[in-house]
Amino acid sequence: MLVVGEASGDAHGAQFVDALHKRDAGLTIYGVAGEQLKRTQFEALFSVAKLTGMGLVELVGNAGNVWRAYRLLKRTLEQRRPNLLVLIDFPDFNLRLAKHAKSLRIPVLYYVSPQIWAWRRGRVRQIARWVDHM
């Protein structure tokens, strides 16, 4: 399962998925996708467009979508039990998802890590606890 939260993550995710499919065309990869990931062999469970917003009004308006996406992805982790959870940036959302995956013993790879120095130093402890590879 792969989760992105913004356009730049979508571009990185699309390159990552393409590279994986070159190694193993039979892989099933699913999660949150933007337009670029949707053009790859990727099963989009939720659109990144519903998660993003630039201003306060958009963020407040998207709160319901963010909550729906989080619940959907938690259920997906529980039901489908992916071999790996791949996270790309979007730290406030993705670290919570990493914590849940870890409780299910699903390995977590943070492919594009959050910027620790710019935001919260306490994130280092969360990452150390919930992320297997970075």
Which positions does each model-derived feature cover?
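Active-site and donor-binding regions of nucleotide-sugar-utilizing enzymes
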Residues: M1-H133
